[in-house]
Swiss-Prot record:
Keyword Ribosomal protein attributed: no
Record's function text: Catalyzes the ATP-dependent phosphorylation of N-acetyl-L-glutamate.
GO MF term list: acetylglutamate kinase activity; ATP binding
Binding site residues for substrate: G66, G67, R88, N193
Enzyme Commission code(s) on record: 2.7.2.8
Name listed for the protein in its UniProt record: Acetylglutamate kinase
Site (Transition state stabilizer): K31, K256
Entry-linked SUPFAM superfamilies: Carbamate kinase-like
InterPro entries in alphabetical order: AceGlu_kinase-like_sf (IPR036393), AcgluKinase_fam (IPR004662), ArgB (IPR037528), Asp/Glu/Uridylate_kinase (IPR001048), Glu/AcGlu_kinase (IPR001057), NAGK-C (IPR041727)
GO BP annotations listed: arginine biosynthetic process via ornithine; L-arginine biosynthetic process
Matching Gene3D superfamilies: Acetylglutamate kinase-like (3.40.1160.10)
Keywords: Amino-acid biosynthesis, Arginine biosynthesis, ATP-binding, Cytoplasm, Kinase, Nucleotide-binding, Transferase
Organism whose genome encodes this protein: Methanosphaera stadtmanae (strain ATCC 43021 / DSM 3091 / JCM 11832 / MCB-3)
Main localization, broad class: cytoplasm
Length: 298
């Protein structure tokens, strides 16, 4: 006799079928961040979701962050992390630690997790094959915690000039999942620290990704940060710009939202902000009618 659980599984598979067909052979950019980077269960769930996307015919691409781990490593080495207005100041010594943590630790851990769940992946950084060419930001206007606007030099912090997508295309065409550390390279061969959200959005646009998925520690875009029920399910880019202008979207959510806006306005079909703390959030967003996060479209 077939039990209810088996019926439920069949219903889930049938609901997923239209989306599997629609996104077959499409590139899906996933930005690993927040809880999905530090909690063992969340990391495992995210890796399984990513591998499943590959096995049902999609082409997942991963970009990861690593801010908290960088700060922890700096503390262990006796170097105090320095932030101005929430932005990391990256001197030469800090840059060496950033490279060590992003490429040598986090990237390899993600590749190992994907491999454990049956995924073929290759770890690279934005420096490889000049994937992400960048230049130093130089003097940057930063709003200090006391409200004062300062012009500061953040050191080896870069802005993206161009993305050369050939390496990513070569990997996805050969059935690998690229796992990308958010580093860039300048004209003099210097390594630059880049914002991981921005890297994910820029590469997603360049490779004509169907979706950009940003994993965070919030359910989605909230009109009231203290009320999960205020989450917006679907929103257009012009409406999002108004929410930023009106001060409804603030703080660390602004760069994530701006990344989604830029990606969608530059060729990505939809962008999604999801709660990486929720098991299988990627699958629930892609393969169900209503999803579980916020979807951004033009």
């Amino acid at each position: 006799m077939v039990d209810q659980e088996q019926f439920d599984i069949s219903n889930v598979l049938i609901e997923a079928l239209p989306y599997i067909k629609k996104f077959h052979n499409k590139k899906i950019m996933i930005k690993y961040g927040g809880h999905a980077m530090i909690d063992e269960n969340a990391m495992s769930s995210t890796a399984r979701d990513t591998v499943l996307l590959k096995y049902v015919g999609m082409q997942p691409i991963v970009v990861h962050g690593g801010g908290p781990e960088i700060s922890r490593s700096m503390d262990k080495m006796g170097k105090e992390p320095k932030f101005i207005g929430g932005l990391r100041v990256t001197d030469k010594e800090t840059m060496e630690i950033v490279k060590m943590v992003l490429v040598g630790k986090i990237n390899t851990e993600i590749v190992s997790k994907l491999g454990f769940h049956g995924g073929k992946s290759v770890g690279i950084s934005g420096k490889d094959s000049y994937l992400v060419e960048a230049s130093r930001k130089g003097l940057t206007k930063v709003k200090h915690e006391n409200g004062e606007v300062l012009e500061v030099d953040l050191g080896y912090v870069g802005k993206i000039d161009r993305v050369n997508k050939q390496l990513v295309d070569d990997l996805t065409n050969n059935n690998y999942i690229p796992v990308i550390s958010p580093l860039g390279i300048d004209d003099d061969g210097n390594t630059l620290n880049l914002n991981a959200d921005t890297v994910a959005g820029s590469i997603a646009s360049e490779v004509n990704a169907e979706k950009l998925i940003v994993l965070t520690d919030v359910p989605g875009i909230l009109t009231d940060p203290d009320d999960p029920e205020s989450m917006i399910r679907r929103i257009r880019t012009d409406e999002l710009k108004e929410l930023i202008k009106d001060g409804i979207i603030t703080g660390g959510m602004i760069p994530k939202v701006e990344t989604c806006i830029n990606a969608v306005e530059n060729g990505v079909k939809t962008a999604h902000i999801l709660d990486g703390r929720l098991n299988h959030s990627i699958l629930l967003e892609i393969f169900t009618k209503h999803g579980i996060g916020t979807m951004v479209r033009e």
